[in-house]
A protein has these predicted regions:
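Solvent-exposed coil/turn segments that connect beta secondary-structure elements
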Residues: 18, 23-27, 44, 62-65, ...
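Short beta-strand-centered segments that line the small-molecule binding cleft or hinge
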Residues: 18-22, 28-55
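A ligand-binding cleft/hinge motif common to bilobed small-molecule-binding domains
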Residues: 22-35, 92-98, 126, 131-162
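Short beta-strand->loop
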Residues: 37-51, 106-111, 145-174
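Extended ligand-binding regions for polar small-molecule ligands
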Residues: 61-64, 74, 151-193
Length: 193
């Protein structure tokens, strides 16, 4: 098993160097729609329907009254983890495309936070180094459940969605969660012993 960045995973799938992938469905939908098919998917208490369990939260400081919707982030500095298959950046880019804007040039800059360090996105936003941050859906709730509530009153989620199947704060449409896609054309998996 290997941990690959989104770009490396795309190249590996295209080169047919992998048979089984564990990645958010956004990767499957946006980066490899014709190369992989879903074998199984993960569900959670926050999203019992695996087909609608992954989204992203766009956060801003509560005192940034100039930032009310995703549209207001045009030309702004955004912090995000971008070298994972999808911690939220792909879902947000999809929302930007729905605004009839080019997601590759919409933001003024994207401040890259190292993978597995999503909490640093909060630091960028709270310190003012970024105007907004992109988090995976349920990241805030996971921090709060772990007892880290120091920033709760200082941030808000833009375009917060409710009642769509995910019991966490999020700004984007929902996608299937973490499927286990198999490369099309892979040899059949042997039966379990």
């Amino acid at each position: 098993m290997h941990f690959l960045s989104a770009e490396s995973l795309e190249k590996s799938v295209a080169a047919k160097n992998v048979d089984l992938v564990v990645a958010p469905a956004a990767f499957l939908a946006f980066s490899a729609p014709n190369s992989l098919h879903e074998l199984a998917s993960i569900v959670s208490d926050a999203a019992p329907d695996s087909s609608r369990s992954l989204g992203a939260a766009v956060i801003v400081r509560r005192d940034r009254e100039d930032l009310k919707t995703l549209k207001d982030l045009r030309g702004k500095r955004v912090a995000a983890v971008v070298d994972e298959p999808s911690p939220g950046i792909l879902e947000v880019k999809r929302e930007v495309a729905r605004l009839n804007a080019d997601p590759d040039v919409f933001f003024g800059s994207i401040q890259t936070v190292p993978r597995l360090r999503m909490k640093e996105v909060l630091s960028h936003v709270l310190s003012g180094r970024a105007d907004a941050g992109i988090l995976r859906g349920c990241f805030l709730e996971d921090l709060w459940k772990a007892g880290n509530r120091t920033f709760e009153a200082e941030i808000r989620v833009l375009d917060a969605k409710r009642g769509d199947g995910l019991a966490c704060r999020h700004s984007t449409a929902l996608y299937p969660g973490w499927p286990w896609p198999l490369r099309k054309g892979s040899p059949r998996m042997p039966p379990a012993p």
